[in-house]
């Protein structure tokens, strides 16, 4: 691709109020260093857990760290798609996005090292076929497709896969599990801080995905059908992954976690995204760039979680 001009040199400069650059500024303001989290108490808490509890927590962590590594690698074609559209603000934000995913991979590995988990963990994914379908096939395929086809429809399919299902359902449900494990028992303070830091980053990631889908739906209503179809295709797989994780432990799930509660939680997070995207239908495209409702949705989810967890404490 031949470079012909610079977005940062255009008359008027960059629109710092646009959604992508608001997210970029937010990430800069909330920078954190994985090496700065204190995991010193987590080792003793880890050793106090039963073998079955450690097995569950290790499997949960394996899913997270493999997922973070996956998205660190798979996000690259989205940057190229933004460049092809001439959207420098989005491209700037996605460089930060990729950096944050790499930090998330780092911090989960640091935690595993701190609690003494050093064996090969691939086996923890073998009993989760829905996980393998999403992370081994659906995610890399959808994002990899952008290298050859950066069209709006392909971007919507990729964003649904990554931002709305992987992050917006699976990751949020996983954070909910960590909160139930750690906060209810007052254990693993390092993991608690880790989840807080990552969750803050990923609220911005999910908001960008929602913004991107809204932008394309506002520009062409046909993209609403693309969004609907992809969500309806992937939500059942995401819910099946939650079921598979519980089925491995029978009727005695460690930490007293409830399948029904987690299925309801995950489904709620998926279904409520439809309304935010559909609200962009027929909207003037110029309004979408300055509409911060995608970030407000993620903040609402976070506030609801804090309230629910406080009620059970």
Swiss-Prot record:
Belongs to the ribonucleoside diphosphate reductase small chain family. R2-like ligand binding oxidase subfamily. Binds 1 Fe cation per subunit. Binds 1 manganese ion per subunit. The iron and manganese ions form a dinuclear manganese-iron cluster. There is a cross-link at residues 71-162 (3-(O4'-tyrosyl)-valine (Val-Tyr)). This is R2-like ligand binding oxidase. It comes from the Bacteria. Probable oxidase that might be involved in lipid metabolism. Its cofactor is Fe cation; Mn(2+). Its EC number is 1.-.-.-. Mn(2+) binds at residues 68, 101, 104. One of its GO terms (molecular function) is metal ion binding. It comes from Mycobacteroides abscessus (strain ATCC 19977 / DSM 44196 / CCUG 20993 / CIP 104536 / JCM 13569 / NCTC 13031 / TMC 1543 / L948) (Mycobacterium abscessus). Keywords: Iron, Manganese, Metal-binding, Oxidoreductase. Homodimer. Fe cation binds at residues 101, 167, 202, 205. GO terms for biological process: deoxyribonucleotide biosynthetic process. InterPro entries: Ferritin-like_SF, R2LOX, RNR-like, RNR_small_fam.
């Amino acid at each position: 691709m031949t470079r012909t001009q610079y977005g940062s040199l255009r008359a008027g400069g960059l629109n710092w109020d646009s959604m992508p650059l608001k997210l970029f500024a937010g990430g800069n303001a909330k920078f954190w260093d994985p090496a700065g989290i204190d995991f010193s108490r987590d080792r003793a808490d880890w050793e106090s857990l039963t073998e079955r509890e450690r097995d569950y927590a290790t499997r949960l962590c394996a899913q997270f760290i493999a997922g973070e590594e996956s998205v660190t690698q798979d996000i690259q074609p989205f940057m190229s798609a933004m460049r092809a559209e001439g959207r420098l603000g989005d491209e700037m934000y996605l460089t930060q996005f990729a950096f944050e995913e790499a930090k998330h991979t780092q911090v989960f590995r640091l935690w595993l090292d701190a609690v003494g988990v050093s064996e090969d963990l691939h086996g923890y994914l073998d009993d989760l076929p829905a996980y393998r379908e999403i992370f081994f096939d659906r995610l890399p395929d959808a994002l990899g497709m952008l290298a050859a086809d950066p069209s709006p429809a392909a971007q919507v399919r990729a964003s649904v896969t990554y931002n709305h299902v992987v992050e917006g359902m699976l990751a949020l449900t996983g954070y909910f599990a960590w909160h139930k494990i750690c906060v209810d028992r007052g254990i693993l303070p390092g993991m608690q801080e880790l989840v807080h830091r990552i969750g803050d980053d990923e609220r911005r990631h999910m908001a960008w995905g929602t913004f991107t889908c809204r932008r394309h739906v506002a520009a062409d209503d046909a993209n609403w059908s693309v969004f609907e179809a992809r969500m309806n295709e992937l939500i059942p797989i995401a819910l099946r992954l939650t079921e598979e994780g519980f089925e491995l432990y029978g009727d005695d799930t460690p930490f007293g976690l409830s399948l029904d509660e987690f299925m309801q939680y995950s489904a709620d997070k998926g279904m409520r995204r439809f309304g935010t995207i559909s609200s962009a239908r027929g909207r003037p495209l110029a309004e979408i760039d300055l509409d911060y409702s995608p970030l407000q949705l993620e903040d609402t989810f976070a506030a609801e979680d804090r309230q629910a967890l406080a009620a059970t404490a």
